[in-house]
Amino acid sequence: MKQESGRSMIEMLGVLAIMGVITVGATALISSAMRTQKRNTVNEEVIQIVTGVRQLLGEYDDFSGIDNKKIFGAIGMSNKNTYGGTYELGVDSSNPRQFVVTINGLSKSDCEYFVTKAWSDSVEYQKSDGKQSGATGNCNGENGQNSVRITYGE
């Protein structure tokens, strides 16, 4: 009988199955890392926006002069966020000494994340002694249609 060398079909299928499992695992890790990076970017941009508004309008008695185009131009950043939505600034209608940062264009899971995240410098977070996140949101829309509001000021 003659000796044959090479791989059998079963061995090749085993190798392909292992490679498939590795690929699925790597894809999940990459997706998680990208989601975390986007969330961190939004957090940093909100901090930059809040700092900019306070520096530009902090000397006034209230934030009634807030203007999206002027503020974003003055702080040197776009009002676009990493989710393809926008940031919006506005005066709190119940208290002109407070301003609201709105994050638009979020998926349901990202909206829920930002609503539960501790926005430590926000009005509601400080009033509750850290028991509330400081954000409110509408997270029931379709992906890309959800928004989160965070109030800052006194």
Language-model regions, residue ranges each:
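Extracytoplasmic/periplasmic, Sec-exported soluble proteins
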Residues: K38-T41, L106
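Weak global preference for isoleucine
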Residues: I10, I18, I22, I30, ...
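N-terminal single-pass transmembrane signal-anchor helix
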Residues: M1-R35, V42
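N-terminal alpha-helical signal peptides/signal-anchor transmembrane segments
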Residues: I30-T36, N43-S64
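Periplasmic/extracellular, small/polar-rich flexible segments of pilin-like filament-forming proteins
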Residues: Q55-E154
